[in-house]
Amino acid sequence: MKKLLTLIFGMFLAVMAGAQDPIFSQFYAMPLQLNPGFAGTAAAPRAGIAYRNQWTGFNSAYRTYAAYYEQSFNRLNSGIGFHLEGDNAGDGIFKTNRFSAAYAYRLKVNDFIALKLGLEMGVHSVSLNWDKLIFPDQIDDVNGITFNSEEIRPDNTGRTSLDISSGLLILSEKFYLGVGLKHLNTPNQSILRIKNNLVPGLPIRYTFHGGTEWVVKKGNKGKEPSFVSPNFLFVAQGPYKQLNVGAYASLGPIFAGSWFRHTFGNADAVILLAGFREGPFKIGISYDATVSNLANNAGGTFEVTMGVLFPHKKRLDINDCTRMFQ
């Protein structure tokens, strides 16, 4: 019991002192969360939802929900997208909600390379359920929670701020590269004060990602090609850094993948993915097998995503290397 309470309280302080965005293991399934430059990258409108349960060994440690919709306007060389995300830490103690709209402009460099410049604006809100907090002065060594806390409730247990992000994509038939800059204005999510100073705003999140695509079997009418896509994802936000390296493979209606995630302080997890595609629908299930010192207590991370790529008559002239995102 004490171990769980200590975890939740420490987790709350960590969120307040230097919050970080949730990063989906199936990052390809939430492209706008990765980089606003992905708005309108697919040949047709697409949408998706995702659910992530992090550290299943603890009771509702972190749960994240997300949804998006985006489409292209070929005649305008443009794309738009909308992203909604909710993050629930400590079984409802601390909640984060985000809603944003993205616009991306596509600039064709030549017959082989295109650039996409993305801009995203939205709102970022945080809320604290003070009544669910358990403080050390409430715990009796013998009887457990028996006292009222002397901690003072903040005047404001919620805050909403403007959130601005941008991104760049380089697309070709042989590779893709991208950089995303989230929270450029470092939204103020302060609820607590430390030594009479407000807790700093949400740190800028730097995301670098890229990959290539090897076609194993060419597609034909009604059938997508089979391919393997080696890729990487690097994220830095405040003191936190992570690197995912692995590959995604699509073989007919079945797809799978495996990545290794390293957090620079230590090896973190091995990510295993399996899924299938039926018509315009795509469902993926992944599991993060924790290999760090948390493995014995925290358990792994479970994630499920579902996407739909609406029917289309033709593909964009340059986007073949991002099929794993579609």
Region locations from a protein language model:
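Sec-dependent signal peptide recognition
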Residues: K2-G10
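N-terminal signal peptide c-region/cleavage motif recognized by signal peptidases
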Residues: A14-M16
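Subset of outer-membrane beta-barrel
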Residues: Q20-Q326
